[in-house]
């Protein structure tokens, strides 16, 4: 049995197509190499995005204006109504509890005043609207804002 070495490896017969050698003699891909006679396409490839005499697409589209503030803080919102559905008996609700109700693992939370408070909540969130704080405090609860 012969020892197999890397330089002995060959692809299976018929699995690889032979490279077409253009411009070698007067066969099918000889002389003009299948490019026809004269013209731009016979001489050099046309660059991507070139549209002939027409204004190219990338020049007809307006440039982006303004800027994006990378320090902007995005808040996930939760309403009092949804909070009451998740915790009907009220009690202490932490920021992590609120995040699990929203269905996110990270980020900031803002409490909004949509809905009515019927039970006492001691809630901790990153931010809360003034109306939401008023509704919870009127039901003898407290709102702690982290930010």
Swiss-Prot record:
GO terms for cellular component: cytosolic large ribosomal subunit. The keyword RNA-binding applies. Keywords: Ribonucleoprotein, Ribosomal protein, RNA-binding, rRNA-binding. InterPro entries: Ribosomal_uL15, Ribosomal_uL15/eL18, Ribosomal_uL15/eL18_sf, Ribosomal_uL15_bac-type. One of its GO terms (biological process) is translation. Residues 21-49 are annotated as: Disordered. The keyword Ribosomal protein applies. It holds the Pfam family Ribosomal_L27A. One of its GO terms (molecular function) is structural constituent of ribosome. Belongs to the universal ribosomal protein uL15 family. Part of the 50S ribosomal subunit. Binds to the 23S rRNA. This is Large ribosomal subunit protein uL15.
